[in-house]
Amino acid sequence: MKIIIIGAGIAGCTIYLELRKHLPKPPSGEAHKFTVYEAYDTNIDTTSDDRGNGPTYSSTLIVGGGLGVAANGLNVIKRLDENMLREIVRGGYSCATMNMKSKNGKVLARMQPAGKPALDGKGQETMNTVACSRHGLWRELRKRVPNDVIVTRRVSEVVARSDGLNVVSFVDGSPSAEADLVIGADGLKGLAKKALFPGEKADPFPPHYEGLCGVGGFVPYSLVKGHVEIGSMNFVMGGNGFFGYFIAESALDAPHRDSPYHVSPPGESVGWWSTYSVDECPDPKSVDKEDILKQLRERHKNWKDPVICKVLETSKVTSMYPTWIMPPLPTWERDGVVLVGDAAHALPPTSGQGSSQALEDVECFSLFLSHHLGKAYESGGHDPTDYKGVIRAAAKQYMDLRQPHVKRILDHAQQSQNRKRDKTAIEEYIMYAFMWMIGWFPNVMTKPLKQLVEYDIASEVYKLLHVKS
């Protein structure tokens, strides 16, 4: 099978690794052929700042800052490569506790979806969320993709053909490439999506700016030592925005710094981010970051949380990310062109599930495709040059399983992110009162999150395949 992957970000690199691991070998013995197209340099040591500000296929290649990978996403990585999981955790920090706070630093509610952190060094039964840099997560994935598989070339068009190989064309006029399967891992504003709706001149499902923008950066842990609970991720809400912070790395000598089941002593930095309402979407390429920092200080000048006060005194804005989402697509596949990750469903940061859902997508589709391809090979009657039916069957089950699950996460995230919008003083304190009351019932508050992070996409796939068989 000839496979083209558009985008070498988190989803693109992971689906290459998943397909390479799971796809059965053809009866002919000839290996499947993979090519990954990415518009930007993907050298593992190249940072987002080095790549410039042009359009790209992979949001992870241009957006800096941090992210949280929840247990459901970490388990995808664990099943793929346990050594890679340890490297990713080593480069980040295991967070067992989620603190919801008022702007003055008062804890209103606490969630511990993996249970109370163990104090005896034995670790927990369930993985914690791992906070890490986007680049750090991507770097570990990229290290495992051979350099000769990735071609630095910008795609101009993808055409899904019902009666032959799908066609990928390029901006530089290079000869078009053909493939049985084209994976669109090209992000929120990707081109692969257009192949699913060929009769439309304009994008029928354009991304939507949500009226919220985030900025973020890092400060030395020494500045806030004693004010950040070990093993915590903190969410601070007020009437004119939102602020979050987390320990960004473990101490270098921590014995369990590569374990998501343990909480380690902190390292040298703390990550922070702030989300605020703004009607018109700012352009991260041209915005004046000094002006943004000035606005940040003005917005939070009356907030008394000690960590926020230190951040405002010393920090610089290093990343900026407007909140975009995409309306639910009626399909993620057409004639062998399949979308994964943000290309299929862009989730707001409030979900805490952007990277984890992309990881679930790629494992899910890879397992379904491997199953149907294996059955086709075993039957002996399969035309080795015609994979349309196999891809269609796998994609249908992939969408049937994933679309309702992702839609539920999106609906909940959109409700939650309303807490980040500007409020009157009365609305602000009603929010505090509600959260304080919910905080008295931690099991009730934690249950939905616990169900989400304990979701096992591989088991769900195998259950569905067992029922069908």
Locations of the language-model features?
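Alpha-helix termini
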Residues: 20-31, 54, 199-203, 224-226, ...
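Conserved Rossmann-like nucleotide-cofactor binding loop
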Residues: 11, 15, 42, 189
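Extreme N-terminal starter segment of soluble prokaryotic enzymes
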Residues: 1-4, 32
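Conserved mid-domain beta->alpha element of the FAD-binding
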Residues: 5-21, 183-184, 215, 317-415
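C-terminal helical "tail/cap" subdomain of flavin- and related membrane-associated enzymes
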Residues: 29-30, 351, 367-469
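Conserved N-terminal helical subregion
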Residues: 2, 18-20, 57-64, 68-218, ...
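Glycine-rich FAD pyrophosphate-binding loop
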Residues: 8, 20-63
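Conserved FAD/dinucleotide-binding core of flavoprotein oxidoreductases
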Residues: 107-112, 118-133, 172-176, 218-320
